Amino acid sequence: EILNKLDVALDIHSVPTEIHQTIGIADLKHLDFSRDVLKTDILLVDENFDRAGSVVSFVNRNGGIGLGVECGSHADDFASQNALQSILRLLVKMDMLDLNLDEQDKKTEIFRFFEEIFPETLNFHYLRSYQNFSELQPWEIFAQDWEKIYKNQTLAPKYLGIIMDKVILWDGMGFLFEKLS
């Protein structure tokens, strides 16, 4: 019930493993707002939050602005600072705090969700080791599940991201993204 009343939600996460990039998620229609608040290395955007069950998705579906940010590793002080800075930027952006943060502009790569990758069996595997947001050329084959092959079936490069290393049936193994900038 509380989520239905939110104008803005900032969902902050850290991860147990080492991470080299900060990642934000937002609705494409709030792109400028998101860039100002999150200042991440990578910003993932989508226009369709109908299916996802996250706080970010729920708030976006219900007319608010839902933002998510992966700040870094649990054990890294950088993650705590990044979370704090995201909160401060949000409060400044909403005119709830008068503070000069004196930050440098950050180059943010922006990717739009294109397609989720679903395994059919536990035999699903990537054909090589990929880094998050590896570029896939048109028609490039990147995974296999018994006889089924997974490839970039478009005429433009796509980017493989949020890569999972353990197969869980009915759950995604990653996403293909379009690079917007």
Which residues make up each language-model segment?
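Structured catalytic-domain cores with a bias toward divalent-metal coordination
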Residues: 1-181
